[in-house]
């Protein structure tokens, strides 16, 4: 009986000690692994409010002293440079085309590519947008796509601007690299500067004298559009090749008066029949001479 009592007491004391030890252990905080909420925000993830060098505070001389006159001067000048309306930039990728011959002049839309462009034009018409500007890449497939779209929307063809900066190219070496597409470093050097210049030409917040929201239609190319999306949203531009957009798709970016940028559509082709959804050159017509 004594042995049993001693065993029971020993076991109870052991369990009590174990319980008290566990009770006093510090509790580890549980975090959702994907949020990284226990770490400070990486500097590269912070939004650059002056990305276009048009932040109103950067355009006005700062306050020099605490005098009310100086503060009034600052507020008055600041009010004059504050945008009041948004800029909507709608990007259209060209339709499916034939990679025939060695020059751009022979790279015409396929019949399906022409139909894709018509569907896109009809969709843009349905959206009821009042266009302020229509600008097209000077490459044949973009010109043909723009011409078909213009038959469907309310915009005079004579007012269309052509821009060589929007031509297709290699914007920046992608991450991760891919084995099937490796342009020379010289091509990235040449095309990258041009495509970045195109971004700076068309992406900026509204000027203070803009009296209403504006709508700009850009007809261009897959690589250029994907690079623009990354740059506008301040994602790493090297990520552009991780995005895939269909032929004649609609991508819609909005630059608010504050300079914040949001995306409404990314490569939208939901308005097309499924047999018209393509994103690559037809294999049977690739590099045909």
Swiss-Prot record:
Its EC number is 3.1.3.16. SUPFAM superfamilies: Phosphoglycerate mutase-like (SSF53254). GO terms for biological process: positive regulation of mitochondrial fission; protein dephosphorylation. Its main location: mitochondrion. GO terms for molecular function: phosphoprotein phosphatase activity; protein serine/threonine phosphatase activity. The chain crosses the membrane at residues 7-23. It is found in: Mitochondrion outer membrane. It comes from the Eukaryota. GO terms for cellular component: mitochondrial outer membrane. Keywords: Hydrolase, Membrane, Mitochondrion, Mitochondrion outer membrane, Transmembrane, Transmembrane helix. It holds the Pfam family His_Phos_1. PANTHER family: PHOSPHOGLYCERATE MUTASE-RELATED, SERINE_THREONINE-PROTEIN PHOSPHATASE PGAM5, MITOCHONDRIAL. Interacts with Pk92B/ASK1. Belongs to the phosphoglycerate mutase family. BPG-dependent PGAM subfamily. This is Serine/threonine-protein phosphatase Pgam5, mitochondrial. It comes from Drosophila pseudoobscura pseudoobscura. The lineage of its organism: Eukaryota, Metazoa, Ecdysozoa, Arthropoda, Hexapoda.
């Amino acid at each position: 009986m004594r042995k049993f009592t001693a065993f029971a007491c020993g076991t109870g004391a052991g369990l009590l000690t174990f319980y008290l030890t566990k009770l006093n252990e510090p509790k580890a905080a549980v975090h959702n692994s994907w949020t990284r909420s226990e770490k400070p925000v990486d500097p590269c993830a912070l939004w650059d409010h002056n990305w276009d060098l048009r932040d109103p505070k950067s355009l006005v001389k700062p306050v020099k002293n605490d005098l009310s006159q100086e503060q009034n001067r600052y507020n008055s000048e600041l009010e004059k440079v504050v945008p009041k309306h948004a800029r909507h930039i709608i990007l259209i990728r060209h339709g499916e085309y034939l990679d025939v011959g060695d020059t751009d002049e022979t790279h015409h839309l396929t019949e399906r590519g022409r139909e894709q462009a018509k569907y896109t034009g009809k969709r843009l018409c349905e959206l009821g947008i009042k266009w302020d500007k229509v600008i097209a890449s000077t490459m044949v497939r973009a010109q043909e796509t723009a011409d078909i779209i213009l038959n469907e929307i309310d915009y005079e063809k004579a007012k269309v601007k052509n821009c060589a900066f929007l031509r297709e190219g290699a914007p920046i070496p992608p991450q991760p690299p891919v084995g099937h597409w490796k342009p020379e470093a010289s091509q990235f050097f040449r095309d990258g500067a041009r495509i970045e210049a195109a971004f700076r030409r068309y992406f900026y917040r509204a000027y203070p004298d803009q009296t209403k929201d504006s709508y700009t239609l850009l007809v261009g190319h897959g690589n250029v559009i994907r690079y623009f999306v990354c740059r506008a949203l301040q994602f790493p531009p090297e990520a552009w090749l991780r995005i895939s957009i269909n032929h004649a798709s609609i991508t819609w970016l909005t630059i608010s008066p504050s300079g914040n940028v949001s995306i409404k559509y990314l490569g939208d082709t939901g308005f097309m029949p499924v047999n018209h959804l393509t994103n690559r050159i037809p294999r049977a017509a690739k590099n045909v001479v």
